Structures are given as C-alpha cells and as structure tokens.
Amino acid sequence: RVEIHVASLNYGETARLMRPRYQLEQAQHLARVLRAVDDNVHVVYVSPFELPEDVVDYYRRLLSLGEAGSGDPAETPRQSRIGRGARNPFGETSDDVLPGGAFTVVVPELSDRFPSSAPLAQVCLCSPACVKRLRYLAHSGKASPVLIPGVSSGWAEKQLALLLNTPLLGPDPDVSSLYSTRSGAKRVLHAADINIPSGAHDIYDEEDLIIALAKLIAGRLDVQRWRFATDSDNGKSGRAFLHVENLEVV
C-alpha cells in the first residue's frame, strides 16, 4: 500500500492568519512516516517546506531499529528501509520507487511562493511538478494508493485525489464541514439518543445566545459555572466561562 499523507489543516482564512506558526503546525504530522514500520506500507509524506537532513535521518534510523543486525542505532540503516528520494523529491529514477517499509518526503516546488497561511493541499494543487511526482509514486507499482488528509478533508484534498486518481481516506468535504464542529457532533449525539451534558448548540447570534443561556441557568440552578466554546476553537482559544454567582438576576 502506498499512503500519500497531505497533512493540511483546513482552518478558515481568519483562523489561519491569526496563527503565526500555521505552516509549522502543518509539519507536526511528520511522525506519520513511522507508519512505514509495516513492511507492506510505503509512506509518501508531503511537507510544507524543506526538512533538515538531520530530521529525516532521525526518522530513518527509527525505522531501521526493526532491522536485523547489531541493534546499534548508529549503524547505517539498510537502503531498503529508507526513502532515497527524499533529498531530490522530483527526480524520477528507479531508486525513487521504494519497497514497503520506507518513506519518501515530497516538497511542493512552489511552496516558497505562497504565504505561510496557505493550506498545504492548495499549494500542492498549484505545483504541477509535485502533482506529477505524487501520481508517479502512487501508480508506479502494483501497490494500492490512498490519500490521507490532515485533520479533515476539504475541497483541495478532494480535487487532489481526483488528479491523482487515488481514493481519499475521509468523509466528503461537505459532510466533514457539517459534522466536524461542536454543533455537528451534538447533532449526531442527539440523533443517536445518547445522554450528554446540558448545553446548547447551533447558536449563531447574540440573541440566540442570551435566550439559550437564560433557559439553561433557570433550568439547572445547581450548575454554578457554564463554559462557552466556539464551534471550531482552533488552538483552544475560543473558550470562556461564566460564574452564575456573579449574576444579579436571570
């Protein structure tokens, strides 16, 4: 199996612009290359920027620990377990078609021309050499390819999967955007008739918030503190608390 990991974080534009380390956060999924510990899996990891060689070597050596040998981590790993195409992601030599138990790092050739707030999947779509390279790695052998997105799939991941003629592991973007929020999760739990804590969801303006909060406080006088959370508080920043004892009247 060939796993193409495009760990794009599909936050809204405002949320992305407010995250100065957004590009680095997209690269935090690098540990996915360790899925290549399975000899039947070859991992193609798409990185938003060029990775330092010592970082790539670190993961290569982690994978090499499962090899037969002296067990010394300093021992050079066997070539069959590493991605020799990592330093030259667009070269199409026979060495780039790697067996299972290995990984290849691919960097979109136009990544440095996009702002740091650009989602990785969109950068891939605008990088023709990267798309060509991913298609080559996905279909050069008999292994079954699959595209694995980041936190959730969006229109860019869907379009990329169509270009690569590769299945997308994840829900349809329309379904994902509908149920990946807190309100969406609440709707699913209510439909399944599962007991959940008291609360309100699908609140879209101040008037709805005040009415829902007044009903909750009046109906649960034993609750002394209520927590507010936005539907998608990326980075846990969209949270607040209300202490009922500070209210004079409800």
Residue ranges and their predicted role:
Residues R1-S180, G184:
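ATP-binding N-terminal substructure of ATP-dependent carboxylate-amine bond-forming enzymes
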Residues D172-V250:
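Active-site nucleotide/adenylate-binding loops and adjacent lid/helix of ATP-dependent enzymes
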